Amino acid sequence: MGSKIVEKKRKSRDSDSESDNELGDGLFDGVLSQSEDEEDYIPSSEVDEDDDDDADESASEDSDDSNDSEDDEVEEDDEALLSDEIPSEGESEKDQDLAESKESKQDQDKEPSEPEILEPFVDPPRKEDEELEDRNYRIEKDANGGIRYVYDEIDPVYDSDDTDYNVPVNTIGNIPLSFYDSYPHIGYDINGKKIMRPATGDALQNLLDSIEVPEGWTGLTDPNTGKPLNLSRDELELIRKVQQGLIPDDVEDPYPDTVEWFTSVEEKMPLSAAPEPKRRFIPSKNEAKQIMKLVRAIREGRILPYKPPEEREREELEKEEEFYDLWQNEEPQPPNPMHIPAPKLPPPGYDLSYNPPPEYLPTKEEREEWEKMDPEDREKDYLPTKYDSLRKVPAWGNFVKERFERCMDLYLAPRVRKNRLNIDPNSLLPKLPSPDELKPFPTVQQTIFRGHEGRVRSVAIDPTGVALATGGDDGTVRVWELLTGRQVWSVKLNGDEAVNTVRWRPTKDTFILAAAAGEDIFLMIPTHPSVTPALDQASRDILNAGFGHATNGKQQANLPPGKEPPGKWARPGTRLEDEGVLLRITVRSTIKAISWHRRGDHFATVSPSGQRSSVAIHTLSKHLTQIPFRKLNGLAQTASFHPLRPLFFVATQRSIRCYDLQKLELVKIVQPGAKWISSFDVHPGGDNLVVGSYDKRLLWHDLDLSNRPYKTMRFHTEAIRAVRFHKGGLPLFADASDDGSLQIFHGKVPNDQLENPTIVPVKMLKGHKVVNKLGVLDIDWHPREPWCVSAGADGTARLWM
C-alpha cells in the first residue's frame, strides 16, 4: 500500500509539472462559458485521501477476514442473500463473478504454482483484497441488524442520459450566496448536509497559489461552492480543438471513407449473349394483313393515296394561317383587393330603338348637316333609324370600332379609387368679407354706345372723365359723351384697316387722343363741348412742336445708307387735318397696343408681327422713334410704363420683363406660368401686377415677394382679353373675357408690407353678346368714379355704374 501511495504522489507531481507546461500560453479567455458544471470537478488531493482511506479499510478488513475459513465466507454470502436488501441484477451478476473467482482460486490452490518472489518486510498480496477493491459496494448493517449493500454513486460519462448529472452540488436554488455571509456554511447538498465554507488563505498564500498554477487553473471561484474553479482534462482538450479549428466531437469522423454508390468501371460486355431469335428476321403476318386491307381500300377507291390539287392548295393555305389563343396559357389569379371594376356602358335610349318615336327621327336637312360635320364635332356617332320589324334590323356596323375604342379607353385610362373625406366645403374656403361691405363698385348697366359697324376693339375715357373714345373694325374713331351716350365726334382713319387701340394722353392740360390703325399711329384733337379754345391751342402746340426740332434731322443722318427709319412723322393730309387729325407716325408692322408715359411726352407701341422692331418708344416733343431692343426673346404682346419709377414692362407669350430705363438693364423677369399672355396692368402703387391670359386665368403678382404668381383665379370659361386697375385710388380692378362677361374684383393693397393683399370677387357683369366666339375685347375705368366701360364684339360699348 505504501508503494501505491508513493506512485500516486509521483503521478500527481508529474501531472502538476505537465499542467504548468500546458497553461504556459494562458489562452483561456472566455473558455469558462463553454465548460461543464464546476461541481463535477474533484481535486486530486481529495482523491488521494479517499484512496488512502480505502486502502486502510481494505487492510483492516483483510486482517479480520484472514482468521476465518472458506466455509464461513460461503455462509456469509448465503446470509447476505437472505437479508432484507435484495440486490439488483447488476449485484447478482457481481456475486456470480465473485463465486466464479472463488472457484478459480480453489482450483489454483489445488494446482501447484511457482513460488512468487516477495519484497522483504512486505506482506504478500492476498487475492481476497484485490476482489474487495474491485467491488463497487460496501456492506453495512441496517436498523434491524441485517446486512445492507450500499453502492457507490454512479459517475455518468458524457454520453449518459442522466439528466440529474448537471445539477449543482449546492441545492439552495437561485438564491444569492450573500444570504449566507453570516453563517459558516454556504448551502446544502443533495442529502441535506451542510456545505461548509472553504478556508481562505492569506495574501501570501494567494500569491503562491497564483505562481504555482495547478492543472486546469482559471483564477476564478465557484459561487456555489466557494472553491477554486478549475478545468478538467476533457475541457482543456475541448478548448484546444476549438482554438485549432478542429471538430470538438470525437465521435464524428472528419475524414470518412468514400462510399461508391455507383461503379466506376465501364462494362463493355452485354449482360446476355443469347443469339437473336428467328422471329425478328421474318415479316410479321399481322402487319401483312393490315397492309392488304389498305391495298384493297385503295383499289376500291375508298382511300385516295394522293389528294386533288385543289384540296392540297386549300390545306396549304390553312397551314399558313396560324391562329393563336390569347388566353390558352392564362393562369387563374386570386382576386385583387385593390381591383376597381370597369364602368358600365350607359343603357340605350329611345333614339337607339328600331322603332323610335317620330320626334327622334332626323329630317333631311338635319341628316345632311350631320353628314357634313367632322366626326369629332358630331354630338352622336349615329342617326336614329326606323325599321318595320326587329328581324329587319341589320348588324351594327360600328360594333367592332366601338368595342375597340372602349378597350383602348379601359387600357389607357387608369382607374383610381378616391377616398372621399367628409369635410364641409365651406370650411375650406377662405373667409372673405361680404361684397356689400366693399362697395362702391359697378353693379348695373347704365348706357349703351351704338354706332360702330362690326366689333368695337378698344375704349378709353379721357383724364377729365367726360369723354369716351372708341375704335372699331370699321376704321373709325368715335368720341361720345360719357353720361348721355351721345356721339359728338367721328373720323374715318382708314377704310381697309381696323382701329386696334385708342388711348388718351394722361395729362389734363391737353386733349390729345392717339389711335392705331394698321401700321399708322394718328394723333388727333377731337371736338367736344368741354374743350375750350385755350385747351385746343395748347394741344396743337404740343403736336406741332416737334416738326422744327433738329433731332429729326440727326435721326435721319445717323441711319446707315439705304435703311429706312423705324418711324416716319408726317402730316396725315388735308382731309384728316380738317377733321382734327394733326399727326401721323408710320412704323414697320401692324400696331396692337399703345401705352403712354405718365408725363405724356413718351408713348410705346407694340407690334407682335415685327421681329426686331416689335417694341418702339416714341418721343412726342422731338418726333423721335426708337427701337430699344436689338433682340427680344419671344413675341411681344403688350408693354407698359411703371406709374412711379423709370421702369418699362414688356410682356411676351410666357413672361414679363422689367427694364430700368435709366440704368438700361434688366431688373426682373416675372413668370406667370400662363401659356399665352393677353394683357397686363401695373397697380398704381407700383408693387403689384395683374396678368390675363388666353388660357382663362387671371394672375396676381407681388413684385416684392416673388416672380411667381401670388394668386391664380379662374372665373371665366373662355379666354381673358383685357385687365385694368382703377387709377383713381379705389381698390378695384376688372377683367374682360370672351364668354361675354366682366368680373369685378376688390383688390386692396395694404401699406404694411407684412400684410398680404386682399382679393375678393365682388360682381360679375353680363350684357355683351358673344359673336364668333368673341365677347368683351377691352375695358377701361373712370379716373375718379367707380365706373367702367367695356367694348364688345357685338358692336357696342357699355357703361357700368
Swiss-Prot record:
Residues 91-113, 124-135, 362-377 have a biased composition (Basic and acidic residues). Signal peptide: none annotated. Residues 1-135, 358-377, 546-570 are annotated as: Disordered. The keyword Transcription regulation does not apply. It comes from the Eukaryota. Residues 35-90 have a biased composition (Acidic residues). Changing residue 486 to A: Weakens, but does not disrupt the interaction with YTM1. Pfam families: BOP1NT, WD40. InterPro entries: BOP1/Erb1, BOP1_N_dom, WD40/YVTN_repeat-like_dom_sf, WD40_repeat_CS, WD40_repeat_dom_sf, WD40_rpt. It is found in: Nucleus, Nucleolus; Nucleus, Nucleoplasm. One of its GO terms (biological process) is maturation of LSU-rRNA from tricistronic rRNA transcript (SSU-rRNA, 5.8S rRNA, LSU-rRNA). GO terms for cellular component: nucleoplasm; PeBoW complex; preribosome, large subunit precursor. GO terms for molecular function: ribonucleoprotein complex binding. WD repeats lie at residues 451-490, 494-534, 586-628, 631-669, 672-711, 715-755, 771-801. Changing residue 486 to E: Disrupts the interaction with YTM1. Keywords: Coiled coil, Nucleus, Repeat, Ribosome biogenesis, rRNA processing, WD repeat. Component of the NOP7 complex, composed of ERB1, NOP7 and YTM1. The complex is held together by ERB1, which interacts with NOP7 via its N-terminal domain and with YTM1 via a high-affinity interaction between the seven-bladed beta-propeller domains of the 2 proteins. The NOP7 complex associates with the 66S pre-ribosome. Belongs to the WD repeat BOP1/ERB1 family. Component of the NOP7 complex, which is required for maturation of the 25S and 5.8S ribosomal RNAs and formation of the 60S ribosome. This is Ribosome biogenesis protein ERB1. It comes from Chaetomium thermophilum (strain DSM 1495 / CBS 144.50 / IMI 039719) (Thermochaetoides thermophila).
